[in-house]
């Protein structure tokens, strides 16, 4: 019989019979050389055959196995319920598959994945049990080791205070930890990476960004760091190609407290710089006032010398005049410079943000500060800290005067616009102008600039070649306008 005839009569029994006729020992040879452990028992479950793979697996020779019950291999590690389920299935003449912990001849235990099939004769009577089993101890050990590693890794990741997330090449989340899930829940169930508007593809390996995000109505600052992870394909079609698009590990840490501490430190340093600027301006203003007061008698002495003649020999008059001139020169040398920093161009929005941060705690339900700009792209020019000190002096003055009018809630409006090369700052409030001009502060001698805010503002504005205008508002209150030249105005358009 040819193979074509066998295929034409595609019946398993016919094919098996034909192969047996052509190759009488084929099936026996196949079973003998099979790498799978195969055993055959009679209907009473006594072993009547075992192939070499079975003997190698169990440690018993074929002679030792013949006429023995397979319970010879059983161990107490397999639960009794497993055997009961197995025999219940086999007695119903159904095949059974499961896992058993068997014992070798040397006492060693091993785990097998076993298939037992009842073999029936043509009359449907049970004649044999065919068992094929594979030792899966090594694969099970590796599987459990991997599971333990995954459990350990998940436990470690979930106990890390930072959020950890792995994304694929399309920025889809592949794995995340409990902290990341908590962040997403706090964001109203939205994906945290989407809220941060961050893409690892746009960040280089090891790159770090500090980004703000609104969590439960409050702004929090998160540090985002990325690392590339080598990928291994999970698709069966890429079994022989051990490569896959790289994934990205992202660690997201809450640095809000550190950010707040840094910001508070920066504001404290800014306060110190502003206080130093106010103090220098107060000293300069006081010395200028002293120079003006001293200049009058010195001019009178100079006039007297001219009337008497410079060579008249009036020693006392000449000595008084020289002492006065030297005193004037000493005072001039003592006048501090107001140049605490170099002139520069800076954006106005962060400037106003700093002003609001400095005075946020001083405004409550009875005091309101509103800041507006004609354009979000406005810039200022000059010494940023000194111009900030100008606004600070005015706010200090206004808040102090408003405290004397407890029945009137304070409202301050700050508006900025650019007007033909000048930056104009409009400060409007509801404090009467007369009180602003003539109010006296009892703390003028105890605090730098206290009680002389308007004069100090004039000094700082004049130093920046600016202009100041103080007027009463038609609807009541005071309007202070500060005008500062922009860079183009001072340089004739050259930058």
UniProtKB/Swiss-Prot annotation:
> Which residues belong to any copy of the PAC domain?
94-148
Q: Write the record's keywords in alphabetical order, separated by commas.
A: Nitrogen fixation, Repeat, Transcription, Transcription regulation, Two-component regulatory system
Q: Work out whether the entry's keyword set contains Transcription regulation.
A: yes
Q: Name one GO biological process term.
A: regulation of DNA-templated transcription
Impact of mutating residue 465 to S? In strain: NG13
Q: Which residues form the PAS domain?
A: 23-93, 151-174
Stated consequence of mutating residue 250 to V: In strain: NG13
Question: Which InterPro entries does the protein's record reference?
Answer: DGC-Regulatory_Protein, HATPase_C_sf, N_fixation_neg-reg_NifL, PAC, PAS, PAS-assoc_C, PAS-like_dom_sf, PAS_fold
Q: Which CDD domains match?
A: PAS
Pfam families listed in its UniProt record: PAS (PF00989)
Which function does this protein serve? Answer: Required for the inhibition of NifA activity in response to oxygen and low level of fixed nitrogen.
Q: Per its UniProt record, what NCBIfam families does this chain match?
A: nifL_nitrog, sensory_box
What PANTHER family does this protein map onto?
DIGUANYLATE CYCLASE DGCT-RELATED (PTHR46663), SLL0267 PROTEIN (PTHR46663:SF3)
What protein name applies here? Nitrogen fixation regulatory protein
Q: Please name the source species.
A: Klebsiella oxytoca
Where is the organism placed in the taxonomic lineage, from the top?
Bacteria, Pseudomonadati, Pseudomonadota, Gammaproteobacteria, Enterobacterales
């Amino acid at each position: 019989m040819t193979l074509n005839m066998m295929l034409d009569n595609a019946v398993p029994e016919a094919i098996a019979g034909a192969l047996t006729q052509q190759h009488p020992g084929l099936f026996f040879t196949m079973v003998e050389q099979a790498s799978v452990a195969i055993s055959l028992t009679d209907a009473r479950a006594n072993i009547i055959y075992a192939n070499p793979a079975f003997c190698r697996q169990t440690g018993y020779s074929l002679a030792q196995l013949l006429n023995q019950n397979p319970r010879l291999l059983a161990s107490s590690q397999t639960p009794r319920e497993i055997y009961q389920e197995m025999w219940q299935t086999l007695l119903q003449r159904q095949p059974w598959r499961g896992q058993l912990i068997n014992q070798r001849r040397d006492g060693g235990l091993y785990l097998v994945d076993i298939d037992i099939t009842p073999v029936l004769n043509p009359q449907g009577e049970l004649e044999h049990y065919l068992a094929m089993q594979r030792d899966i101890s090594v694969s099970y050990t590796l599987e459990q080791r991997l599971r333990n590693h995954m459990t350990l890794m998940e436990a470690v990741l979930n106990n890390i205070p930072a959020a950890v997330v792995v994304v694929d090449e399309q920025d889809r989340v592949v794995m995340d930890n409990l902290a990341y899930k908590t962040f997403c829940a706090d964001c109203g169930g939205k994906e945290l990476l989407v809220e941060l508007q961050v893409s690892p593809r746009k960040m280089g390996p090891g790159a770090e960004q500090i980004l703000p995000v609104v969590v439960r109505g409050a702004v929090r600052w998160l540090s985002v760091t990325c690392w590339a992870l080598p990928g291994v394909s999970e698709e069966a079609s890429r079994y022989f190609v051990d490569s896959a698009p790289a994934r990205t590990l992202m660690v997201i840490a809450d640095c809000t407290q550190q950010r707040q501490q840094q910001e508070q430190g920066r504001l404290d340093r800014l306060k110190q710089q502003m206080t130093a600027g106010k103090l220098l301006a107060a000293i300069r203003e006081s010395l200028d006032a002293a120079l003006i007061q001293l200049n009058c008698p010195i001019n009178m002495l100079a006039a007297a010398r001219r009337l008497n003649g410079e060579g008249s020999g009036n020693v006392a008059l000449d000595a008084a005049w020289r002492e006065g001139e030297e005193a004037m020169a000493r005072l001039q040398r003592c006048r501090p410079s107001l140049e605490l920093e170099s002139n520069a161009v800076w954006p106005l929005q962060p400037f106003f943000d700093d002003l609001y941060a400095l005075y946020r705690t001083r405004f409550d339900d009875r005091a309101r500060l509103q800041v507006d700009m004609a354009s979000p792209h406005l810039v200022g020019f000059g010494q940023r800290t000194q111009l900030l000190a100008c606004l600070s002096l005015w706010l200090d003055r206004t808040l102090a005067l408003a405290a004397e009018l407890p029945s009137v809630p304070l409202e301050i409006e700050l508006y900025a616009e650019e007007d033909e090369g000048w930056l104009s700052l409009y400060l409007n409030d509801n404090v009467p102008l007369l009180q602003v001009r003539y109010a006296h502060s009892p703390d003028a001698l105890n605090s730098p600039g206290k009680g002389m805010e308007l004069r100090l503002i004039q000094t700082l504005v004049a130093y920046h070649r600016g202009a100041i205008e103080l007027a009463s508002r038609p609807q009541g209150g005071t309007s202070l306008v500060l005008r500062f030249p922009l860079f183009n105005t001072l340089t004739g358009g050259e930058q």
